[in-house]
Amino acid sequence: MGSLDPLAWRLADGDPDAPRELVERHHIELYRYARALLRDAPAAEDAVQETFERAFVALGKYPEERIETLSLRPWLYRITLNVVRNAWRQRRREVPMAETPERTDERFWTVPGSVSGADYKEAWMDALEALGRLSERQRVAVALRYLEDLPYAEIAETTGWPENTCKTLVRRGIGRLGALLSDAPDGKGDR
């Protein structure tokens, strides 16, 4: 499913403007993804920075054949997922999803095509707390599908899981989220 992304070629060829363009194009979406999984703004920022560092190094070493088939966006999400998993291992525990994200971190609340506001943030807070109660695989699949709006083919490419597995994980994860949110103790479970 590779696509010829001219930016990948420019990065591999050492174009001095290409790294800035890559960061501008993908920073917010990768930050939002890492932030949803790590639940820690500084750790998410570190994860995204490490993602870009790894990407720049790898592209400089890849053979031409690899660059020809590289789908840049799923590849960056996969690097981010690997960096996040390393952070989880370093913590020697599951993702601390009981913590709540800072309400002032506007990048986290910026979702393409959405409206902002207190109701939106509150609904996301509830959803993200419930997201933390999913299995790691369901959490990753649901975040990629609904937080980052990736198609199933890109989720499969990002995670290395079969596309049907991704669909199943998302379906089961959404079902579990629905059950968790409908049982919300504050009466807000019907969102």
Short names for language-model regions:
Residues 23-41, 58-61, 131, 176-183:
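Amphipathic, Lys/Arg- and hydrophobic-enriched alpha-helical face
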Residues 46-53, 70-82:
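Structural recognition of an alpha-helix C-terminal capping motif at a helix-to-coil junction
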Residues 1-29, 36, 129-132, 154, ...:
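N-terminal module of bacterial RNA polymerase sigma factors
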Residues 57-64, 77-99, 120, 178:
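Arg/Lys-rich amphipathic alpha helix in sigma70-family domain 2
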